[in-house]
Amino acid sequence: MLSIRYVLADNAMEEGPLRTLVAQSGDTYLYENAYVLPLGFMMDEDVAEKWDYAGGGDIGTQNQLANLLGSDRLLLTAVESESKAGESSFVAQDSAYYYATYSKTGVDNLQEQVSSGRTRGFTKVSHGYILDLGYCEAGEEVKVTNTANELVQLVVYRLDLMALRTAYEALAAQAVEVTEVSDTRVKGNVDVTQAGRLIFSIADEDGWTLYVDGKKTDSETFGGAFISTYLTEGTHEFELRYKSPGFLTGAVISAAAVMLFAATMAGRRKRKKG
């Protein structure tokens, strides 16, 4: 949901309730996502404080957040699957999007094969992340294989679209309006009807400085990843400025080097004249 409106794929079988094919060029396909949050959005402060993003595991944290945002249904529910050396498989009991987690492995590449003919490859699997198995129709068989013939124990989950919609609508209710974007600046405004946490889908990395209503503002890291700050009710203007870390030091060193070079050349010219 985080500001990713379009995705590229190498096949024409990625459409589903959350993704629509909008363009094609050769073997490259452009899809538009249905639920896309803007660059910034508000979250109730109580939700932000209660969400245990670090202690519930990849799936548990997402289910907890959806619940805090108002859903009375699990966002992701485990389904029956089977794993053996070189292959994991399951049969989709419902038409839905499916995801999978797995135990630590040294395998780097996995290949998904769906009985409908759709395929998908996963790389750098040893880094550990949630596998997006895509949209499957009820009755389709899904296999995830590896050429190393290693046991990769998958746990497969079904996405509940109603829970997703509830969470999305809660976050999209108070969204920012971006008025200016450049390589070093993002400006906009937000109408806050309920005080809470403004969260930007921008990584909280060195180099960013936040201004709210013209004043430099200390930001916080939300979810261990994103820039955020607390806002009161009312209309606020914001600006995020970016300056590459070490830029000033580098500029001083460069200037000093230029001055040293100039002084050296001037000295050489004087010696030649003498």
Which stretches of residues belong to each language-model region?
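Conserved luminal/periplasmic juxtamembrane motif of membrane-embedded glycan-processing enzymes
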Residues: 1-86, 106-119, 126-150
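Active-site-proximal, structured, solvent-exposed surfaces of multi-pass membrane proteins
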Residues: 71-274
